[in-house]
Amino acid sequence: MQKKFDEIRIEDLEVFANHGVFPEENTLGQKFVVSAVLFTDTRMAGKTDDLTASIHYGEVSAFITEFLQKNTYQLLERAAEELAEALLLEWDRIEKISIEIKKPWAPVRLPLKTVSVKIERGWHTAYIALGSNIGDSKMYLDNAVKALNELPTSKVEVVSEYLVTPPYGVTDQPDFLNGCLKLRTLLYPYELLAELNRIEKEAGRERIIHWGPRTLDLDIIFYDDLVLEEADLCIPHVEMHKRKFVLEPLGEIAPYKRHPISGKSVCEMLVELNEKEK
């Protein structure tokens, strides 16, 4: 069940800025009207009457104004996307944000009052499995954790201990070093997959033998409670419940995380797998 957040609302903030497709819009400028909903937890501020326990909407309004005035975009879509990301990165207390940017009297030569773009963006929690059985496996895993933590829109929150595990599938190969991590990210699933593939490639990963030896293997196990089934990406990972080398380190950092389809927790899946292997 998703957590319900409180809301801090900023409505119809007027900003004179220079966004648009036409050159005149970029040079002469025009009025934009911005509304924002900041999804957060106001409980502590409500109990203590302490502004530092909340989000200062005056500072947020000033940030929005400055951001839209110092940057120039052709599309409202781009302006909204960049603004939402900037706000989420600037204030840790904002878990999710809704942004609407209105453009009154847009130059379309028709009698309209306004056009607008409204988006909702927020933080997501992903669990990533790590594995290596070629070369300095610990170095490869450590470097992968570091690379993920250095992504501007992601933060590694917890990393499991690394475990030495026997190979899965193709057994005629060296033992693996495996682990799992919890990632807080603004990336969407396919964006995250692209980053994982990039990190694997930089580690010299070659996809020659299915389930074969590799310098680095990174898999998305969970992404919030998303269920996604595509040819090139399935979430939750379809084999996770069969893999002790995933469930053991994952159980260390998220034992009660539940599978969105089966409803079973990670520790329950691990117990069942151990029973089957007896």
Describe each PLM feature range.
Residues 83, 87-88, 148-149, 196:
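Hydrophobic C-terminal alpha-helix "anchor/cap" residues
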Residues 125-145:
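Extended accessory regions or peripheral subdomains of proteins
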Residues 43-58, 143, 148-188:
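Short, surface-exposed acidic-centric catalytic microdomains
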Residues 94-98, 154-160, 213:
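A short coil-to-beta-strand element that immediately follows conserved catalytic motifs
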Residues 29-33, 92-94, 112, 174-178, ...:
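Short connector loops at helix/strand junctions that flank enzyme active sites
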Residues 100-104, 162-164, 221-223:
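Short loop/turn motifs enriched for small/polar and acidic residues
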Residues 1-128, 132:
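N-terminal, polar/charged subdomain of small-to-medium soluble alpha/beta proteins
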